[in-house]
């Protein structure tokens, strides 16, 4: 069990270095009062209570949030280990189930975003409830309370108590299993009814975002999730959060294999006929969703597939043991060695795939290809730059991203599409990552206002101006007109002379006497070979700001036009 926990931490270690995802920032905005937080029953524990306690305690430091998420994941590994060992009566089976589950690459988004903490919370409460149920006696009476906490962490576990009706190694009759599970089954039914009612009439789980359909999309969604699980070549499962039309061949083949295992290993102590329904019951609530096919939805269902793998290994181990008349046959040792090798190989492959996902950049940029990681990294860069500039004080900030230099990338694939055009319907990655600035205000209380500018706009003279490099890094330019002058100089230095001229001309319309703006504006004419216009603008600088140090430099150069 300890080895499985250590392996889990090693493979999932990169999650500790992450920042906040967009959904994290949205919830933090609710906590600090920048968004209206409507009262809600669903996700009461994982959203309202957790963030209500964590935000005042941890503030904008992302590490403690991720430590809690990873700690919950390790807890689930240990709970799954105990549950499988108790059902399968095999430590080898438990190692396989816990090892495969803990070190999976599928948990990238469940552990990378704090907002998805409902997934590990729900699984922890569910496994805890089932372990108490298995113990019997007074412990069984507490189990429904834990399951209620599971549903209030993530409602998708609502159907899982049905697996308690499946036969176990104890040989209890169906009537006895039904009697023991009745409290949790009734609770499950009540929650399911409430969920259906709230999904129809509630804003939180209703509306277009949670639109449902009950046709061929159910099968297509199931095949999509199945392919994400079984395709070892894909380092980016769930990169496009939508049904994958290519998933059917692989998904269907994997489903046939699963059904075959259910039949072949039906006499196992922990038969696949237990884990397979877990997989399906945990997925059923999300399969009808038309617009949502998210990787983190696999967190709880994948525990069922891990049980299938563990149960099959335990069954093979028992078959090998049954062939010996005395002692432990060599076949058992071989099964155990093979099981450990499978877990280690799976962990190594997952580690490689996660490394690819964390390090791959969009072509021609230093920005992450993965859309969730991309937004998180961009938000971190903005937070670092603004926090350093304000240094604990207050101020207004604006991010300058000239529209003439924008390039449109697909938010799904990260591929460059074309240069941006006016009214194209695109949005800046920076504005999207910061929820139009509200996320930055939630992280830094000293930010009184945040804006995103594509050109000089009147009314921003007292704003601290920032810009963004092709690596996603944000950097301070200066306040108001000074910031635009420096932005113009940067554009000229990178060869973007005409965009610089357009930018500076707009700023000069409000600040015609600002010497740095005028000087950089004159430089744009120099680099396009229009010496007459350059001399004219330098002469205007001398006339409007004769006492500025730049005016002295112009006089010494003798380049200004004389009246």
Predicted stretch roles:
Residues 1-482, 486-487:
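Polytopic membrane enzymes that build or remodel cell-surface glycoconjugates and lipids
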Residues 482, 516, 550-553:
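Start-of-helix register in tetratricopeptide repeats
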Residues 493, 527, 557-561:
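Register position in tetratricopeptide repeats
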């Amino acid at each position: 069990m300890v080895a499985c926990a250590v392996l889990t931490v090693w493979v999932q270690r990169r999650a500790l270095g992450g920042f906040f995802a967009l959904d994290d920032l949205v919830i933090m905005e609710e906590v600090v009062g920048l968004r209206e937080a409507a009262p809600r029953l669903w996700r009461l524990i994982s959203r309202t209570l957790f963030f209500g306690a964590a935000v005042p305690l941890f503030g904008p430091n992302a590490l403690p949030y991720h430590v809690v998420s990873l700690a919950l994941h390790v807890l689930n590994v240990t709970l799954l280990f105990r549950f499988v060992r108790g059902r399968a009566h095999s430590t080898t089976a438990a190692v396989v189930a816990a090892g495969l589950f803990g070190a999976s690459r599928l948990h990238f988004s469940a552990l990378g975003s704090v907002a998805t903490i409902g997934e590990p919370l729900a699984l922890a409460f569910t496994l805890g409830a089932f372990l108490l149920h298995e113990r019997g006696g007074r412990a069984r009476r507490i189990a429904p309370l834990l399951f209620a906490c599971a549903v209030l962490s993530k409602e998708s576990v609502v159907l899982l108590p049905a697996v308690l009706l499946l036969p176990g190694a104890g040989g209890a009759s169906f009537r006895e299993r039904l009697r023991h599970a009745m409290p949790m089954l009734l609770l499950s039914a009540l929650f399911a009814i409430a969920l259906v009612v709230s999904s129809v009439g509630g804003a939180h789980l209703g509306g277009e975002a949670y639109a449902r359909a009950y046709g061929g999309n159910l099968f297509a969604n199931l095949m999509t999730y199945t392919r994400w699980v079984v395709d070892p070549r894909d380092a980016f499962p769930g990169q496009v959060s939508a049904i994958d039309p290519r998933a059917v061949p692989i998904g269907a083949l994997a489903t046939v294999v699963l059904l075959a295992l259910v039949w072949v290993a039906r006499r196992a102590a922990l038969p696949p006929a237990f884990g397979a329904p877990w997989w399906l019951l945990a997925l059923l609530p999300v399969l009808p969703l038309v617009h949502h096919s998210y990787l983190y939805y696999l967190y709880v269902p994948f525990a069922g597939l891990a049980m299938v793998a563990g149960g099959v290994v335990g069954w093979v181990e028992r078959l090998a043991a049954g062939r010996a008349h005395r002692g432990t046959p060599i076949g058992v040792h071989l099964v155990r060695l093979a099981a450990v090798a499978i877990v280690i190989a799976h962990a190594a492959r997952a580690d490689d795939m996660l490394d690819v996902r964390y390090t791959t950049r969009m072509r021609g940029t230093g920005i992450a290809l993965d859309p969730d990681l991309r937004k998180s990294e961009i938000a971190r860069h903005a937070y670092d730059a603004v926090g350093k500039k304000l240094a604990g004080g207050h101020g207004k900030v604006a991010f300058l991203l000239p529209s003439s230099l924008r390039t449109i990338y697909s938010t799904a694939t990260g591929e460059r599409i074309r240069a941006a055009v006016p009214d194209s319907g695109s949005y800046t990655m920076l504005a999207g990552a910061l929820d139009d600035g509200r996320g930055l205000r939630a992280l830094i209380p000293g930010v009184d206002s945040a804006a995103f500018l594509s050109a000089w706009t009147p009314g921003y003279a007292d704003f601290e101006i920032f810009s963004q490099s092709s690596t996603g890094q944000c950097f301070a330019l200066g306040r108001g007109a000074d910031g635009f002058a420096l932005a113009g100089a940067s554009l000229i230095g990178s060869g973007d002379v005409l965009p610089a001229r357009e930018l500076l001309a707009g700023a000069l319309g409000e600040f015609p006497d600002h010497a740095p703006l005028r000087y950089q504006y004159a430089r744009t004419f120099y680099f396009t070979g229009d010496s007459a216009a350059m001399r004219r603008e330098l002469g205007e600088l001398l006339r409007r700001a004769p006492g500025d140090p730049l005016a002295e430099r112009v006089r010494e150069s003798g380049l200004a036009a004389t009246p």
